[in-house]
């Protein structure tokens, strides 16, 4: 067996998580549409969002490229969460997610249409609370909620 050094996943480089170049993103989404795609789920939840996260860019991209973009709410793996998010109670997490669904993300008018929770194994305390909160959110809003507990290295972000 050979061990290769220097190989990383795209999410390991913080810059790969930036959604701050709408023109470049429109071009990429147009490729997706030409290949037959019609809807993208943008699941940059708490722990994956950075200061450059701008949900209004998603509106611009959706309109320009002619695809649906569903923004997600939720909490990512505990190791990625800011300190204050790690300390939230189940109810505080639920209230935050309901707010993003009913009122919008980060002061924008972009409302979330899905709940995504990052899970590692064994579940960290904040991940367990986030899963519990997601059940409250789904019960209150009817939004889709999910997590893939079989994925430890989230290659689905590639």
Model-inferred region functions:
Residues 148-158:
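Glycine- and Gly-Pro-enriched alpha-helical subdomains that act as flexible
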Residues 43, 72, 146-150:
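Structural motif
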Residues 11-19, 117-122, 147-149:
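Glycine-rich phosphate-binding "P-loop"
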Residues 46-47, 76, 152:
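Conserved beta-strand edge residues that scaffold enzyme active sites
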Residues 39, 60-63, 68-144:
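Active-site gating/metal-coordination segments in enzymes
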Residues 2-67, 92-110:
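Alpha-helical scaffold segments that flank or form the walls of functional sites
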Residues 53-56, 129, 157:
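Generic recognition of short, well-ordered alpha-helical segments
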């Amino acid at each position: 067996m050979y061990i290769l050094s220097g190989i990383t996943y795209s999410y390991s480089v913080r810059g790969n998580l930036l959604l701050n170049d709408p023109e470049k993103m429109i071009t990429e989404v147009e490729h997706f549409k030409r290949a037959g795609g019609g809807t993208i789920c943008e699941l940059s939840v708490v722990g994956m969002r950075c200061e450059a996260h701008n949900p209004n860019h998603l509106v611009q991209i959706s309109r320009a490229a002619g695809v649906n973009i569903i923004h997600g709410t939720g909490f990512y793996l505990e190791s990625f969460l800011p300190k204050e998010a790690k300390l939230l109670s189940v109810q505080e997490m639920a209230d935050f997610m309901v707010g993003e669904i009913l009122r919008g993300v980060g002061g924008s008018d972009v409302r979330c249409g899905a709940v995504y929770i990052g899970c590692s194994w064994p579940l960290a305390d904040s991940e367990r609370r986030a899963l519990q909160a997601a059940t409250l959110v789904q019960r209150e809003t009817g939004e889709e909620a999910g997590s893939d507990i079989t994925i430890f290295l989230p290659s689905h972000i590639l």
